[in-house]
């Protein structure tokens, strides 16, 4: 898929004509599954019931399995994986915990629950939009981002071209039954009607997001644009170890890794039925090496 990227949700009377369904009105269990959307603030929820009351470790709540949380495995959601990787780059020790958007105080994942050894001191969760600043303030080795004028232009390739192709390939292609279903739909409920409803909502949300940019959803166009974006990112990386020639990986490296790792993960969900986007990335050997380097240096314990 999982970004992000606001207007408050309004409670409406059941007698009122419901507004046209849009990306910003999906049910709570699936809101903001996609990286950076929907752009909606939901009422603050209580912390997950499994949240520890006496903690001496930071806990990052992400989309993951219970087994993955124990081993610190990379999240299967791009928005979560981005910040999971960035916190590792920042050398901040933390644990991961499995959650969903409905369990998040802000309505979206990821969020951090800082360590609190004092049982009488309440700690405030840190939403994804504030994680970079929190990391800078809490890391013994804060990451200095490169002041490159090209940064925003290249980051837009991730936020637009690659993200759109990701949405299509996960939620609208054949991968919807082999990846989206086992990761985002089946875990939500055992009720077949609920699962069917969530599946339809996910497809509709992805379609409406893609229709913001074109009146027709053309898979070949989306994949071609993503391929061009991968080519541009590979050229940008060149022979450097990290993007923009940095000495250590930063948030841009984390943003790229969030997509490249998941696309290169052959065992994601039940496997890839439509491999076109994955194949386009696999042809970019420097991006593959960049992903493998991060996986080996920062996620070795989860291998």
Indicate residue ranges for each PLM-predicted region.
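Short, conserved loop/turn and helix-capping segments at secondary-structure boundaries
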Residues: 77, 277-288
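GST-like domain detector, emphasizing the conserved glutathione-binding G-site
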Residues: 2-196
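GST-like fold's C-terminal all-alpha helical module
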Residues: 164-280
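Short amphipathic alpha-helical interaction elements and helix-loop-helix interfaces
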Residues: 93, 118, 236-239, 300
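Amphipathic alpha-helical interface elements that mediate macromolecular binding in regulatory proteins
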Residues: 58, 81, 85, 149-152, ...
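A positional/structural detector of protein chain ends, strongest at the extreme C-terminus
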Residues: 1-3, 302-303
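C-terminal helix/juxtamembrane-tail motif
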Residues: 292-303
């Amino acid at each position: 898929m999982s970004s992000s990227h606001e207007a408050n949700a309004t409670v409406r009377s059941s007698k009122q004509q419901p507004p046209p369904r849009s990306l910003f009105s999906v049910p709570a269990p699936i809101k903001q599954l996609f990286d950076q959307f929907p752009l909606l603030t939901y009422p603050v929820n209580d912390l997950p019931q499994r949240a520890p009351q006496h903690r001496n470790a930071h806990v990052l709540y992400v989309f993951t399995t219970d087994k993955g949380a124990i081993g610190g495995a990379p999240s299967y959601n791009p928005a979560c994986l981005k910040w999971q990787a960035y916190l590792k780059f920042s050398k901040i020790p933390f644990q991961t915990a499995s959650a969903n958007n409905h369990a998040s105080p802000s309505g979206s994942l990821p969020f951090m629950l800082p360590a609190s050894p004092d049982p009488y001191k309440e700690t405030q969760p840190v939403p994804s939009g504030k994680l970079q600043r929190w990391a800078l303030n809490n890391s013994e080795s804060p990451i200095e981002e490169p002041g490159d004028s090209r940064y925003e232009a290249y980051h837009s390739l991730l936020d637009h071209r690659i993200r759109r192709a990701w949405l299509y390939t996960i939620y609208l292609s054949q991968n919807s039954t082999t990846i989206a279903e086992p990761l985002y739909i089946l875990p939500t409920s055992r009720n077949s009607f609920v699962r069917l409803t969530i599946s339809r909502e996910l497809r509709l949300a992805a379609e409406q997001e893609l229709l913001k940019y074109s009146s027709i959803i053309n898979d070949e166009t989306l994949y071609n644009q993503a391929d061009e974006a991968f080519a541009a990112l590979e050229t940008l990386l060149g022979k450097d170890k990290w993007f923009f020639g940095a000495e250590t990986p930063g948030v841009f490296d984390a943003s790229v890794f969030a997509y490249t790792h998941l696309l290169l993960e052959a065992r994601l969900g039940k496997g890839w039925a439509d491999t076109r986007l994955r194949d386009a990335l696999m042809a970019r050997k420097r991006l593959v090496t960049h992903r493998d380097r991060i996986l080996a240096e920062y996620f070795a314990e989860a291998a």
